[in-house]
Amino acid sequence: LSGGQAQRVAIARAIADHPKVLLADEPMSAVDVAARTQILASFAAIRSGEPDMALIMVSHDLGVVQHIADRIMVLHDGCVEECGLTETVLHHPTSDYTKRLLDAASL
């Protein structure tokens, strides 16, 4: 299996039992652009088809976070820098660290 296919299989296995919480740790790592698009579509389908399932995603990719998350928590050195609605945090950050991250990511 390719990296993207393996990621999709892992996602399918994880949701097969309809857990209340799904933890995805860097689900876009080591996948190409096409696989990334398919994985994002899988998570979007989970969000719409499993309204009682909470998806907690760890990601360094703010572009992914922007498309998937309702809420975001920015961590720095193991501490919470900022937490809130994704739209608010990404467009009106209060933390200097968050502002630097967003500038670096060109969001």
Describe every region a protein language model picked out.
Residues T37-P51:
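Helical segment within the ABC ATPase nucleotide-binding domain
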Residues R71, C83:
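Short, glycine/charged-rich "phosphate-handling" switch motifs in NTP-dependent
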Residues V65-H67:
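A short, surface-exposed alpha-helical micro-motif characterized by mixed small hydrophobic
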Residues H18:
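Conserved catalytic motifs of ABC-family nucleotide-binding domains
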Residues I11, L23, I39:
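Hydrophobic anchor residue at the start of the ABC signature
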Residues L90-L107:
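C-terminal boundary and immediately downstream tail of ABC-type ATPase nucleotide-binding domains
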